[in-house]
Design a protein with these regions (language model features):
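Penicillin-recognizing serine hydrolase domain
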Residues: 4-6, 30-41, 48, 56-62, ...
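Conserved catalytic neighborhood of penicillin-recognizing serine enzymes
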Residues: 164-198, 282-301
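Hydrophobic "anchor" residues
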Residues: 115-116, 325
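Active-site SXXK
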Residues: 114, 127-158, 252
Length: 396
């Protein structure tokens, strides 16, 4: 009898071990394979847990300005935007903004869709002043990207006497100096330095500035800029309006899209300030819509301002809010302040219209610039300017 109890006890122990092994190693059929959700989620929970859902950046308020600074979404800068085509773009009903009286020509583009949210004579050629430098910067970045003639960001560039003589906005280059190419490009993008732009063109053109300008015009045609012609790499005025660089707001919006595809260019354009010459010279960005500038607008991360007497105050602006990218181009204002305040209002209105067209009632665009005091003369026949070595001292 005692032996039976011993055998029974051993049997129970073995059975218990078998049960434990079964529980530990048995795996039920995968619920995903059976198309059965592991856990039912409410719609709100499902969206929250969906890794593909758009996550909007957290807005942080700048204590000094009281303006919410929207941090750019990293993926949006690296993405390739569809080439903008003004002729085929969806335009819907283009409103006549009551605040746009001060702009000679302009456009607001949704870079993600290519839709035109607003335009005013957007295909009309106008003087573009220093917005010219966007093409100079684009060609430089493309040369670096492809390694054209062995060019890199660290390529040493010796300053020429011709570059030193270029006037207007400048960093006072000296023929005794040599800079890495990147330093000169920063001076072009941030300070809008005309002498640096000339020096970059001379370097990339292997001594032939006008050969580089020819490349600028060829590249403009290649990417579809139909109303654009360059005479120089910096945007300073010619002796007559026929020698001024011209483009249209639609063309400049297209050029801005190509610039968006170059991280370094956008990094420079987004800097409110930067050091030059190892900190001996400060570069201050002319774009007052950037953070820590006079009229900061949430999400603005570029791109380029411009001014000569015949162009008025103009700007090409890139902005991203909630992962959505807009490009604004305005020209012809009689003051930088009016240009900046209108552009900021235009961006606010554009995002409201983009998100809810019915809600965009133009109330955000209340700035009414004074009428333009200087009317830009119509550009004469586009004849290439003769080669000149003398400096053009006119004000930028």
């Amino acid at each position: 009898m005692k032996l039976k109890y011993i055998i029974l006890t051993i049997g129970l122990i073995v059975l218990a071990h078998l049960i434990i092994l079964f529980v530990c190693f048995y795996q039920p059929a995968d619920s995903k394979t059976l198309n059965v959700p592991e856990k039912l989620e409410s719609p709100k929970t499902a969206v929250k847990n969906d890794s593909s859902a758009t996550v909007r950046p957290v807005q942080q308020v700048n204590p000094s300005t009281g303006v919410a600074a929207v941090q750019p979404v990293s993926e949006s800068r690296n993405r390739q935007y569809p080439p903008f085509n003004f002729q085929t773009a969806w335009k819907g009903v283009i409103p006549d903004l009551p605040a746009s009286a001060g702009t000679r020509a302009g456009i607001l583009v949704d870079a993600d869709t290519g839709n035109v949210l607003w335009d005013k004579q957007a295909s009309t050629p106008v003087q573009i002043a220093s917005m010219t430098k966007l093409m100079t910067l684009l060609l430089a970045c493309e040369d670096i990207q492809t390694g054209r003639n062995g060019v890199t960001l660290q390529s040493p560039v010796k300053v020429s006497s011709a570059a030193m003589k270029i006037g207007g906005s400048q960093v006072w280059l000296d023929p005794k100096e040599t800079f890495p190419l990147e330093e000169l490009l920063k001076a072009v993008a941030i300070k809008s330095a005309n002498d640096a732009a000339y020096q970059v063109a001379e370097f990339l053109g292997q001594g032939d500035v006008y050969g580089f300008v020819g490349r600028m015009n060829r590249r403009a045609r290649e990417i579809g800029m139909k109303n654009t012609h360059f005479h120089n790499p910096h945007g300073l005025p010619g002796k007559t309006s026929a020698e001024d660089n011209i483009s249209s707001p639609a063309d400049m919006a297209l050029l801005a899209e190509y610039c968006l595809n170059h991280d370094k260019l956008m990094q420079w354009a987004a800097m409110p300030k930067a050091d030059f010459r190892g900190g001996k010279t400060e570069l201050v960005n002319h774009n007052n819509l950037l953070p820590r500038r006079k009229y900061p607008a949430p999400g603005v991360d570029g791109l380029k301002t411009g001014f000569i007497n015949r162009s008025g105050y103009c700007v090409t602006v890139t902005c991203i809010r909630g992962g959505k990218r807009l490009i604004a181009v305005v020209t012809g204002f009689d003051s930088g302040k009016n240009r900046d305040l209108f552009t900021r209002s235009l961006l606010n209105w554009g995002y409201a219209r983009r998100n809810d067209p019915a809600a965009a009632n133009l109330k955000t665009a209340q700035i009414k610039p004074r009428p333009v005091s200087r009317q830009v003369r119509k550009t004469a026949a586009r004849k290439p300017a003769a080669k000149k070595t003398a400096a053009r001292k006119k004000r930028k």
